[in-house]
C-alpha cells in the first residue's frame, strides 16, 4: 500500500540532516544551501526545513516558528535563495567559537547575490552541544547579472 502524503512527508523528514558535533562550519552552510537549491526535492519546502534544522536556537527565536521562517525565505528579501542555480562559500574568519563566511548565490534569473553568513558553536548542554549552527545571515547584496 502507498503511504498517504502526510505519512510520506513524515518518513521523508527523517531523511533531513540534523546537527551533530562532527559537522564543520562550512559544511553546515553547504547543507543549508544545498537544501535551498533543491527546495522541494524531498517534499514541499524540504530545503527550507533542512535550513531550519541548522539554525541556532537564538536565531529561531527571532525568525520562527517554522511557518514564519518559510514566509521569510520566500519573501523578496531572501527568495533568490530558493531553487538557486549555484553558490560559493568563502571563509572570511573564524575562531573556535564562531566562523564568518561570504556566500555568493547565482539565482534562477542569473543574478548574483552576496551574503555574510555566520555560524557559532552551541555551548549549552543538550543535544546541540558543540554543534555548529547558523546565527546570522545578512540581507543580500546584489552583485548584478552573470550575462
Write out the residue ranges for each language-model feature.
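Single conserved hydrophobic/aromatic residue that forms the stacking wall/gate
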Residues: 1-11
Amino acid at each position: 500500500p502507498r503511504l498517504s502524503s502526510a505519512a510520506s512527508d513524515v518518513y521523508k523528514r527523517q531523511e533531513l540532516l540534523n546537527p551533530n558535533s562532527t559537522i564543520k562550519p562550512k559544511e553546515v552552510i553547504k547543507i543549508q544551501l544545498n537544501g535551498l537549491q533543491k527546495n522541494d526535492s524531498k517534499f514541499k519546502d524540504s530545503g527550507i526545513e533542512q535550513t531550519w534544522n541548522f539554525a541556532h536556537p537564538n536565531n529561531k527565536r527571532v525568525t520562527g516558528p517554522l511557518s514564519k521562517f518559510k514566509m521569510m525565505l520566500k519573501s523578496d528579501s531572501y527568495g533568490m535563495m530558493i531553487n538557486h542555480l549555484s553558490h560559493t562559500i568563502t571563509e572570511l574568519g573564524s575562531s573556535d567559537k564562531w566562523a564568518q563566511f561570504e556566500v555568493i548565490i547565482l539565482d534562477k534569473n542569473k543574478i548574483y547575490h552576496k551574503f555574510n553568513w555566520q555560524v557559532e558553536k552551541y555551548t549549552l548542554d543538550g543535544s546541540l552541544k558543540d554543534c555548529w549552527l547558523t546565527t546570522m545571515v545578512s540581507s543580500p547584496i546584489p552583485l548584478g547579472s552573470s550575462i
